[in-house]
Amino acid sequence: MRNRAKTALVGTLVAATAALGPLGGTAHAGDSSLYAPSDLVLTIAHGEDAASVAPERAVTLTCEPQARGTHPSPQEACVLLGDAGGDVDAIAPPAEPQLCTYQYDPVVVTCXGVWQGRFVDQERTFGNECVMRAETGAVFDF
């Protein structure tokens, strides 16, 4: 009985290794890269928090090894995020100040994915879209 269990276990491991073998090549190819991955999904929704609303707009943003994705300004967004260390709360506002109304129409943004090899899942709420753009520049301008 013990031999059958060992044989079954070995057979399962061999089958799993064979099935996952092609994926191993992909992982090794990523290891030889000079850059840690930075692939993000950015969303915008009207509401106080992301858990209670559905995203109205979403884009992808890849920053390494080159800026690309469905984001309309990937290079500019990657520079701003890079300067902030990938932290949405630390994005420096544009040098040119923008005037916004005090109308309260909350907008919540999310940034989820991988930034320089580490998982990120961030959420931030702004009083309205004007304030969001004034404080995040090109990052959430889509």
From Swiss-Prot:
One of its GO terms (cellular component) is extracellular region. Pfam families: SSI. The record marks 67-68 as: Reactive bond. Its main location: secreted. It comes from the Bacteria. Disulfide bonds join 63-78, 100-130. Strong inhibitor of bacterial serine proteases such as subtilisin. This is Subtilase-type protease inhibitor.
